[in-house]
Amino acid sequence: KKGKGIMTTILKIDVEELKKSMLQRRPMKARFKLSMSEDKAYAYLLAAIMAEVEYRHRVFCSNEDMEKQLQEMAHWLTTPSSHFGILLCGGCGNGKSTMLKAFQQLLNTLHIPKPYNEGTYGIRVVDAKYIAYLCKNNYEAYRKLINVDMLGIDDLGTEPSEVLDYGNIYTPVIDLLTKRYEEQLFTIITTNLTPQQIRGHYGDRIADRLNEMVKKIVFNNCTYRTDKFATRG
């Protein structure tokens, strides 16, 4: 029993040393976080959404659903998480794209510096259909898009599943999501698909990877595309 205990201790030390050595060769990617309190992030996101709504010549009115969505977004952006992306999912016209674009404008306004004097943080936002278009018509630009530090994908599920180029069949969004999963790259996705529909549309492999990759924020509220952006609850 004593010998077994010694071997266990040695094995534990060896495992820890090996782990450290491997991590030095392949450092863990730092998760992007806003360096502020959750309450402050909430207020900043709220201001950004109000500005985005006004930009579209709409009238902003708060409601409980939106406040909950903002709280979840602010919490994820300011606290440690294994997820390196967000999935904003729900019905049509209920604020998912507005949330994504508001976050984009907030980053543009805050001018948060990247480490090692690499400029400031910003997120590129593209429509899912444009990803498929780019894959077929400008593959080099598509490859660069796959690897951007921060990417927003709007309307996941509206794009063609496959594109054909000179006899070659590509799956643009699946390939992009696979690469971003492997590299743990910051990704925000909006979609009208439910998690079950995502699994049916993209298959178990991508659905399982998305489960690990993103935190889900569900938009259950009704459409805002009425006379006002939202009505008071």
Residue ranges and their predicted role:
Residues 2-82, 217, 221, 227-233:
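A short, basic N-terminal segment
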Residues 85:
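Walker A (P-loop) ATP-phosphate-binding motif of ABC ATPase nucleotide-binding domains
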Residues 88:
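Hydrophobic anchor at the beta1->P-loop junction of P-loop NTPases
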Residues 93-96:
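Conserved glycine(s) of the Walker
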Residues 99, 103:
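Hydrophobic positions on the alpha1 helix immediately C-terminal to the Walker A/P-loop
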Residues 105-121:
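Post-Walker A helix-loop "phosphate-sensing" segment adjacent to the P-loop in P-loop NTPases
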Residues 119-182:
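Conserved nucleotide-sensing/catalytic segment adjacent to the nucleotide-binding pocket
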